[in-house]
Amino acid sequence: MTITPQNLIALLPLLIVGLTVVVVMLSIAWRRNHFLNATLSVIGLNAALVSLWFVGQAGAMDVTPLMRVDGFAMLYTGLVLLASLATCTFAYPWLEGYNDNKDEFYLLVLIAALGGILLANANHLASLFLGIELISLPLFGLVGYAFRQKRSLEASIKYTILSAAASSFLLFGMALVYAQSGDLSFVALGKNLGDGMLNEPLLLAGFGMMIVGLGFKLSLVPFHLWTPDVYQGAPAPVSTFLATASKIAIFGVVMRLFLYAPVGDSEAIRVVLAIIAFASIIFGNLMALSQTNIKRLLGYSSISHLGYLLVALIALQTGEMSMEAVGGYLAGYLFSSLGAFGVVSLMSSPYRGPDADSLFSYRGLFWHRPILAAVMTVMMLSLAGIPMTLGFIGKFYVLAVGVQAHLWWLVGAVVVGSAIGLYYYLRVAVSLYLHAPEQPGRDAPSNWQYSAGGIVVLISALLVLVLGVWPQPLISIVRLAMPLM
């Protein structure tokens, strides 16, 4: 097939990030300069973000049999690029105190972002697998970047081994689906998997194994065991990327698969997904209750958030509102997580051994860093789904979609899970306003709000509050992504 100029415009974000990877690689080979390579990475990601406007002008199209560029792809590409930008911004002050090679960090983030963009545009099981591997492989290095710390190295080894096992399940499941359907394209799967075919044992086994592989990547129960350890062991900026870009890109491609291929039409698959969603919501929230480490707490919290999103995915066949719910929820989750992990990154920078991830480190933060404490409070309230924050809009949509689809026991799980979550989110928020210890451990720099990371955290807090009160701009953007499907 011939690639036209129109096709190249549609692929601009992918091409720009790919070019940035090459430029940063050559820059590292020429001369190691932390500031230069960080700047090149941020410029490349910003250029990719701006290029989405030109992609929108080009309109929806199938660029190759493996990739479809449309409003849906643009929305998820934008979210992945924003998360990658925030990760690079938080990493810069953290790496300033890091004595080993700094520059490769940005290279790995860019390659992972490339995988995220590929997933957002994937229209075929082959590009789905390539995208997942492209986002996972750099994360093995990023999680273990602080390799002189035993916990970071342990997290990296754990994530690598379990991720390899999950990829094996995913690939074998795809092979079984291909054996039964004769095609790997999402659209062709939708056409080939007619009435009754979804109950074929081979096909059910294939989709079952794919659920295992994707469930691991999304840290859904019972494939979640790596999550708290990896979140705790990874450097704070890497945990930011793991919690946001990685989850958003993979959930986006699963959403597209469910839209084109009638996977959710199978009663057996719907029941399995409903059980996974229920277990993720309840277990994730219950396990977070007893955590005194803020990164572990946010790790368990992410399990429950993916459970909430799964409710909207199960209800996908009932109407377009599910797509709106997922888009709105993921945007709220992105900004809330960027703010929360951003505060942890600011408190942990520059690198001085383990991160400031103990809840005790944040005790009395309000009395010497009042604005930072206020930002963290807003993020906790948003993650809890309190009204007047963006997190509430997403949770409201998920509940509305669940009610519309008559998924009553999952709606009940969302309500109970949110009530449990309120306790541990408020526990973090309250500790910020207690009396500070006489000898505080870690602290953010006094001028944190003037740093790039501080500005990102403040913008995230502002968006969470403004879009929580007036969500119409966000809803309009999410709706733009739907007619182009």
From Swiss-Prot:
Keyword Translocase: yes
Keyword vocabulary terms for this entry: Cell inner membrane, Cell membrane, Membrane, NAD, Quinone, Translocase, Transmembrane, Transmembrane helix, Transport, Ubiquinone
GO molecular function: NADH dehydrogenase (ubiquinone) activity; NADH:ubiquinone reductase (non-electrogenic) activity; quinone binding
InterPro entries named in the record: NADH-Q_OxRdtase_suN/2 (IPR010096), ND/Mrp_TM (IPR001750)
Domain of life: Bacteria
Transmembrane segment boundaries: 8-28, 35-55, 71-91, 105-125, 127-147, 159-179, 203-223, 235-255, 271-291, 297-317, 326-346, 373-393, 408-430, 455-475
UniProt keyword Translocase, yes or no: yes
Main subcellular location: membrane
One Gene Ontology term, aspect cellular component: plasma membrane
Enzyme Commission number(s): 7.1.1.-
Catalytic reaction(s) noted: a quinone + NADH + 5 H(+)(in) = a quinol + NAD(+) + 4 H(+)(out)
PANTHER family: NADH DEHYDROGENASE
Subunit-structure text: NDH-1 is composed of 13 different subunits. Subunits NuoA, H, J, K, L, M, N constitute the membrane sector of the complex.
Family: Belongs to the complex I subunit 2 family.
HAMAP family: NDH1_NuoN_1
Role, per record: NDH-1 shuttles electrons from NADH, via FMN and iron-sulfur (Fe-S) centers, to quinones in the respiratory chain. The immediate electron acceptor for the enzyme in this species is believed to be ubiquinone. Couples the redox reaction to proton translocation (for every two electrons transferred, four hydrogen ions are translocated across the cytoplasmic membrane), and thus conserves the redox energy in a proton gradient.
UniProt name for this protein: NADH-quinone oxidoreductase subunit N
